């Protein structure tokens, strides 16, 4: 680092390229040692905090008292089902919240596509993601609340 604030390197815009409709590459240089990380972290935090999205915010599974339970006739335990639901990529089309009720009887697989089939305001982006495997004679009924934030 230089001696005084007047001697700091002053970065300039070198290049700005539009890679796609949602992606840009901006090159600024030169930076003092460590300043690039500081600026990059600040930009990342600012951009991430200003993004809006939708996610499953509440799950109620019939007959389940807590997340460490198991469901008769379902291969995964409740904790695995919740972790699979956490990976579901969902979006809301109109409202700020939506409630979706899913009922399935086995043998079959419960997938993220079943969320879209039951919720009119909900769209899914990874419909092939498996939430649970329901065995012969097994059934599951869950209520999902999807919210934005």
Report the location of each language-model feature:
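Protein-protein interaction/assembly regions in multi-subunit complexes
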Residues: 1-149
